[in-house]
Amino acid sequence: MNKETCMKEAEESILHTYNRFPVVFDHGDGVYLYDTDGKEYLDFAAGIAVQAFGYHNREYSEALKTQVDKLMHTSNLFYNEPITSAAKRVLKASRMDRVFFTNSGTEAIEGALKAAKKYAYTRDGHAGHEIIAMNHSFHGRSLGALSVTGNKHYQEPFEPLIPGIRFAEFNQLDSVKALINEKTCAIILETVQGEGGIYPATDEFLQGVRALCDEHDILLILDEIQCGMGRTGEMFAWQHYGVKPDIMTSAKALGCGVPVGAFLMTERVAEKSLAPGDHGTTYGGNPFVGAAVDTVLKMMERDRITEHVKEITPYLEQKLDALVEKYDFLTARRGLGLMQGVVCEKPVGKIASAALEHGLVVITAGADVLRFVPPLIIGKEHVDEMAEKLDAVLEEM
């Protein structure tokens, strides 16, 4: 199928929920993608922070092929070895106590919200609890996750959403404090806001929220779906801050392309929250997914991925800062590790489109931010190539 046929038939058959770029990728290798015409692209999007090890990683591919040939699915009515091994690895990496595997990030958020509500129900003997979320946040598009996503543009067509959600301002502790009442059972936030424009939490804010939660017996839910799995130089971004959540969510690079998410919790929460019959999934945590997650976590630990991210991050920041200094319409850079954003006064969608013409894949975050979330295996030579290509694009603006 050629490019034009693929695009035409996709437009005729797939629901129009995305404004896609006119590119059909055929295969990938390392940090590069190749379209159906054979054109090469340096990938600084990684499938929206998914492909931590890039493309065509032989160890990962072989692990999945082996598991496909052996056993893919049996249901959660039975035990399976791959997901048990994966569970032990993710709990070790996160220093949490219990995990539930889902099919996606938004499902992980749904499970986290249910766990928080059930915890409060068990503790207090009644329902009707509230949750505090953040403005400009993004947690997913299913109804529960959408209810805690602080963006009216996403929410309005689907109202009424889940009641009892109150929104505070990210990185403004007093805003959170003002919303706490006797009904508050949880506070949910992204450790680094992604779709909202790449805003890391400040130390004062995240540590302050943790203290408020401890004071009022409120559960802290940290969304690590985009910023977790080594992207910031720690396995999970909250590990930079000297705090620990009661519940956290993960997805994206957790499976490196295999659809999988997870919500994790401390033993204290697990003892009072979800019990048999409270939650479930048909596909979640099957042997195939287990092989993917187990392999990803094994490779990350063995290859010291977080150390590599810490080493390469200053070089990426230096190159992006140089571009901000050069172009007046670039006004700031912010981010943590290999999750960076550059604020732009010109249309970022047009810049991302123009970058494709130059063989560079970058994406946007909100209306005015160029987002850089490359595979975690990039080297200095890839950062140099990105900066050179992006410089050429910006010259044309």
For each feature predicted by the language model, list its residue ranges.
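Conserved N-terminal phosphate-binding loop of PLP-dependent enzymes in the Aspartate aminotransferase
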Residues: 1-397
